[in-house]
């Protein structure tokens, strides 16, 4: 009986992992280096590789057009599990359909989406050289009529900017979003602001901005969403002044269209275990990242995609792009 049970267990394991990568996996990131999707994936890949030491992941940054360059590329790759993509939710599932609709070659659900690997609140930051020190002063600034630039590095960041402008009745003629190919160059632009060059304000994930906030290179004015950040107890929530700004940076693992079921299952099984791990929890605490248990499956991720679209597309579609 013991031999039979052992044989059944061995067989079940073999079936569960009938497929695994047999050559290096190319990991496409639609941002410049240092974005939240990249840093979260690198940590998870380290955890997965401890269980699968023969598996190698090679990150390839492919920035441009708010991830459209990367997403167009992944559409053309074989669905054999050796090329994956790390889309940002708001960009790939929502705002590409509004701001990049003329250059994208995919639908939001064209791909084989696997699971969400992490989320991070967005933070409104200011340069230390700015005279704006809090949310009330930022509100006054965006309605003052003076020229103001706000650095954004992705669809979620731009969405938060539009909500701030709408709720705060900011001057559309004076306050402009400045687009960067990812959050890292956006936060660096704020850190480099000197009154003439750089950008005075920015919006990006705190997971990316944290080192510069802690180092005093930029100042955190407020967080999006409803989660208080114990790592930053003195930073208020944007919703305290502008209700409804419930926007997060979020990232997932994605395969090319029509990926085989066993390939999807390998990524879902191994990366969901890594997301739930103690090692990742410690990393998340340090980097201000969280995850949703309900989004650790393809079906759960798809529900989130549809919810995002229902909530934000009607609002964002009303933006007048002719002024840009």
What are these regions (language model features)?
Residues 1-4:
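Positively charged n-region of N-terminal signal peptides that target proteins for export
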Residues 22-24, 261-324:
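An extracytoplasmic/periplasmic, membrane-proximal ligand-sensing/linker region
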Residues 38-46, 158-162, 232, 281, ...:
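Short, surface-exposed alpha-helical segments at coil->helix boundaries
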Residues 106-117, 151, 174-179, 200, ...:
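Short beta-strand->loop
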Residues 21-22, 50, 73-83, 97-185, ...:
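Hinge/capping helix and adjacent helix->loop/strand transition within the periplasmic-binding protein
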Residues 11-15:
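N-terminal signal peptide c-region/cleavage motif recognized by signal peptidases
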Residues 33-34, 90-93, 121, 130-131, ...:
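Solvent-exposed loop/turn segments at secondary-structure junctions
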Residues 18-109, 146, 155-157, 167-203, ...:
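N-terminal (or domain-start) structured segment
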């Amino acid at each position: 009986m013991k031999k039979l049970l052992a044989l059944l267990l061995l067989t079940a394991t073999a079936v569960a992992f009938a497929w695994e990568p047999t050559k290096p996996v190319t990991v496409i990131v639609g941002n410049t280096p240092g974005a939240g999707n990249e840093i979260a994936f690198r940590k998870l890949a380290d955890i997965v590789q401890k269980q699968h030491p023969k598996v190698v992941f090679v990150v390839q940054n492919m920035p441009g057009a708010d991830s459209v360059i990367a997403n167009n590329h992944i559409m053309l790759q074989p669905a054999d599990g050796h090329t994956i993509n790390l889309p940002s939710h708001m960009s790939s599932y929502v705002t590409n359909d509004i701001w990049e609709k003329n250059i994208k070659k995919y639908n939001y659900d064209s791909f084989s989406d696997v699971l969400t690997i992490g989320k991070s609140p967005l933070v409104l930051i200011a340069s230390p050289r700015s005279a704006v020190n809090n949310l009330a002063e930022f509100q006054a600034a965006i309605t003052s009529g003076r020229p103001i630039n706000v650095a954004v590095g992705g669809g979620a960041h731009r969405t938060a900017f539009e909500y701030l402008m709408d709720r705060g009745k900011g001057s559309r003629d004076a306050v402009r979003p400045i687009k960067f190919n990812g959050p890292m160059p956006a936060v660096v632009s704020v850190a480099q602001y000197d009154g003439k060059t750089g950008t005075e304000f920015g919006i990006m994930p705190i997971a990316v901005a944290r080192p510069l906030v802690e180092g005093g290179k930029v100042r955190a004015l407020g967080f999006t969403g409803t989660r208080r950040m114990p790592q930053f107890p003195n930073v208020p929530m944007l919703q305290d002044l502008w209700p409804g700004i419930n926007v997060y940076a979020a990232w997932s693992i994605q395969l090319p269209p029509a990926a085989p079921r066993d390939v999807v299952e390998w990524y879902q099984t191994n990366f969901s275990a890594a997301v739930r791990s103690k090692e990742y929890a410690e990393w998340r605490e340090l980097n201000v990242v969280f995850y949703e248990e309900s989004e650790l499956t393809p079906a759960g991720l798809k529900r989130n995609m549809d919810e995002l679209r229902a909530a934000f597309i009607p609002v964002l579609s009303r933006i007048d792009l002719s002024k840009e």
